[in-house]
A protein has these predicted regions:
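Conserved activation segment of eukaryotic-like protein kinases, specifically the C-terminal portion
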Residues: 163-177
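ATP-binding glycine-rich loop module of kinase domains
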Residues: 17-19, 25-56, 63
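Catalytic-loop of the protein kinase fold
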Residues: 122, 126-143
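Activation segment signature within eukaryotic-like protein kinase domains
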Residues: 114-115
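Conserved short submotifs of the Hanks-type protein kinase catalytic core
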Residues: 81-93, 97
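Terminal C-lobe "cap" of eukaryotic-type protein kinase domains
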Residues: 216-219, 225-240
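AlphaC helix of the protein kinase catalytic domain
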Residues: 94-106
Length: 252
């Protein structure tokens, strides 16, 4: 149940506030109501509020997100020194969907839709010179209505205007991230491969995953469009009845 207490700071004044269970390392998160509509608020924890380094990281996320508009990317609305206000998405993360509804991805059409939308939105970011650099199941929402992908959290992104990155998640980070090397489009592509590995029947994407997660960035796909081409043309791996893997062309 959402509280009816008021909450205010220099810019935002909300009709109701509910702190969410999932919190970040440096930010608290809230579901808030503004003019009768739900929004998502990310606010620096007290120990980081007022620290210019963390304020600039929030500013980078907001200024990057605010100029982008894609149906599978969460929308950014407003910024204060210590807070960001974004679209509230009624749904669950990919991690939660896999845990709560493990049968969802056993239907091929659901897997196809998820992969297509994920690739579409990452391709959109790259076309606007933005690297996400923290692609992972916890940063991908699936809406309760229509099960659409919503990519969230541009806090680690890299752009020409903001070349400094602020972190990554080791389990989905490319080798060049872990070693402090040069990042690029293949860095996000590595994470896409690791995300595909999380799907229950990921063996259908065996060839795609193998190329995405190559140790050498130059051996990976060099664009998301290349992945889309292979997925749409059916260049995947199929598990035959004897459970051996065979490379085939699958036509829908």
């Amino acid at each position: 149940m959402m509280e009816t207490s008021r909450f205010s700071d220099r810019q935002f004044r909300f009709e109701a506030v509910e702190q969410m269970e999932t919190q970040g390392a440096t930010c608290d998160t809230f579901r808030v109501k503004l003019y009768g509509k739900l929004h998502f608020l990310k606010r620096l924890k007290a120990e980081y509020a007022g620290d210019i380094r963390y304020q600039e990281a929030l500013r980078k996320e907001f200024e990057t997100g605010y100029r982008l508009e894609h149906p599978n990317l969460v929308r950014y609305f407003s910024f204060d020194d210590d807070s960001i206000l974004t679209e509230y998405v009624e749904g669950e993360t990919l991690s939660q969907r896999l845990a709560i509804h493990p049968d969802y991805f056993t239907k091929r059409k659901n897997t196809d839709k998820f992969v297509q939308q994920l690739l579409d939105v990452v391709s959109y970011l790259h076309s606007h010179q933005v690297l996400h650099l923290d692609l992972k199941p916890d940063n991908i929402l699936l809406t309760h209505i229509n099960d659409d992908v919503k990519l969230i959290d541009l806090g680690c992104c890299y752009t020409d205007s903001f070349p400094d990155t602020t972190g990554h998640t080791n389990a989905f980070a490319a080798p060049e991230q872990l070693s402090g090397g040069v990042v690029g489009i293949p860095t996000d592509i590595f994470a896409i491969g690791k995300i595909l590995e999380c799907l229950p029947d990921h063996t259908i994407y065996y060839k795609v995953i193998t190329r995405c997660t190559a140790e050498d960035p130059s051996a990976r796909y060099q664009s998301v469009e290349e992945i889309l081409r292979d997925v749409s043309h059916g260049i995947i791996s199929y598990r035959a009845f004897d459970n051996k893997r065979y490379s085939i062309f699958y036509q829908r």
